Design a protein with these regions (language model features):
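Acidic interhelical loop/turn segments
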Residues: 97-112
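Motif-centric detector for short Cys/His coordination patterns
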Residues: 1-95, 113, 119, 126-130
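Long amphipathic alpha-helical coiled-coil segments
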Residues: 130-138
Length: 138
């Protein structure tokens, strides 16, 4: 990757429904010149509609890696819990390399703040997981 390029992270909310590549071809949703072979017509994917109304087709593996269902409050709670768990795990991995190592890299006060952040992340994660359990039972 070009070193002048910076990393960007974004999130989009889309509407989607399952659709095969063959159906996408019939609805002219594939890029110009793309015609699925006979074995590709049944390839699983999704019709994706963006906020501006633009529609496209995405292969199932690509779509499912980028998007999670967020139709209900429980869906959104699962997403938040999964994202928080991943951030917490990453921070813990850094801190588990040792306080002294972190302090040498970023300073003692910042390391102490990261330890505090980790503690708050764990507490918040406990609350989210309790909400998930309670919501599932109702």
């Amino acid at each position: 990757m070009n070193e002048q390029m910076k990393q960007y992270t974004g999130t989009k909310t889309v509407k989607a429904m399952p659709m095969t590549m063959g159906e996408a071809y019939e609805r002219k949703l594939l890029k110009n010149g793309v015609r699925p072979s006979e074995c590709e017509t049944d390839k699983a994917g999704y019709l994706v509609e963006y906020e501006d109304g633009y529609q496209s087709w995405s292969p199932a593996d690509v779509f499912e890696k980028a998007y999670k269902p967020s139709e209900t409050r429980l869906d959104r709670l699962r997403i938040e819990c999964d994202e928080l768990r991943a951030r917490s795990k990453e921070l813990d991995a850094y801190l588990n390399e040792g306080y002294e190592k972190a302090a040498a890299e970023i300073g003692r006060s910042l390391t102490m703040l990261l330890v505090l952040q980790s503690s708050y992340l764990h507490n918040y994660l406990d609350v989210l997981e309790a909400l998930l359990l309670t919501t599932k039972k109702e």
